[in-house]
Every structure is written in structure tokens, then in C-alpha cells.
């Protein structure tokens, strides 16, 4: 996930838990700073301890926040939402749309309902520019980097079945396939 974050910006980590990702990115000087946010005080306190231990209080702020509610528009270049179910990610994106849509990129790691997350991104004019999967302790976790774009005309050329397949299995490599278009159905 951390490798998907664009260099040089400010990261908002929604649901930060331990703040490991913001800490690692600041230490590597990949980002200027971060806003580590969590809905629960316990995880946020752990994040604050880790940030203090790394001596990065000057670079990483913490905020108690339900989703993106404590984030201002244009305050973050990258928004990371990871380690939670797809439905919760969709809730955060929907409730925080006025803020999330101002970020240059979304880095998402849904642990379920992946097809619904892809569908949301497509329907809200995001393009998935990078997608990968990691395996930790025998479990596979997809991750994706999406950027806001004008309407992607590629989707208009595909039939509904092909779009559904891309939502389930991922659209990043669909251009390498010979896919049926609306005219062929």
C-alpha cells in the first residue's frame, strides 16, 4: 500500500490504528506529512505513542474522526483507507465525498465487497491506475490506487457483463484482453 502513495504530498490515513503507514512514509521521506485519523480513542492513543516514539510529532497529526469528517477539503493529497470491509470504505467515501473528491488519489484496501468498491470508483469518475494484492498470514488483500478523472470512455464501449467481470476481477489489465463490446452482444 505504502508504495502506491505518490511522493511529496500530505497523506490522510483514515482508520490509522497504529499509524504504521504514515510513520514509515515520513521516515522514508516519501511524504511531507500525514494526518492519522481513527474513530476510536484507543487506536488513536496507540498511534500517538508510535508517532512520539518515532519523534515525528512535527510531521504527523492525529485526529479523532468518524471517517473523513475531521478532514478539510484539499487538506490531503492522498487518502488511505485500508484494513476494513468494502461496505465501510464505501460509507466513508460516500459520507466524506466532498472531502475525498478533493484528494489527488485514493489508496484503498477493501477486505470484502471489492467489486462494490470498484463499481463505486467507476461510477464516481475515478480511474484505478494501480492494483495489486498482498498475502499476509495466508490471507489475500487487494489494494488499489484510484485518481479522479473525466469520464473514462473505455467503459462506454463495454457491455454490462464485461463491466461486471471487471468489477469482480479488476479492471487494470482489461485493456490487454479482447473483450466483447456493446456492438457484439
What are these regions (language model features)?
Residues 99-145:
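C-terminal substrate-binding/active-site "lid" region of AdoMet-derived donor-dependent transferases
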Amino acid at each position: 500500500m505504502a508504495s502506491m502513495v505518490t511522493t511529496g504530498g500530505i497523506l490522510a490515513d483514515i482508520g490509522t490504528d497504529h499509524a504504521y503507514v504514515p510513520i514509515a512514509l515520513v521516515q522514508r521521506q516519501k511524504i511531507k506529512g500525514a494526518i492519522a485519523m481513527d474513530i476510536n480513542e484507543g487506536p488513536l492513543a496507540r498511534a500517538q505513542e508510535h508517532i512520539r516514539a518515532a519523534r515525528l510529532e512535527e510531521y504527523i497529526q492525529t485526529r479523532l474522526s468518524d471517517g473523513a469528517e475531521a478532514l478539510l477539503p484539499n487538506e490531503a493529497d492522498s487518502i488511505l483507507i485500508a484494513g476494513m470491509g468494502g461496505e465501510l470504505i464505501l460509507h466513508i467515501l460516500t459520507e466524506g465525498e466532498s472531502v475525498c473528491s478533493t484528494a489527488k488519489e485514493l489508496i484503498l484496501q477493501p477486505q470484502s465487497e471489492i467489486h462494490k468498491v470498484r463499481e463505486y470508483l467507476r461510477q464516481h469518475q475515478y480511474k484505478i491506475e494501480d492494483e495489486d494484492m498482498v498475502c499476509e498470514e495466508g490471507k489475500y488483500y487487494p489494494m488499489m490506487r484510484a485518481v479522479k478523472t473525466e469520464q473514462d470512455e473505455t467503459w462506454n464501449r463495454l457491455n454490462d457483463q464485461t463491466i461486471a467481470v471487471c468489477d469482480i476481477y479488476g479492471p487494470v489489465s482489461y485493456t490487454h484482453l479482447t473483450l466483447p463490446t456493446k456492438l457484439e452482444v
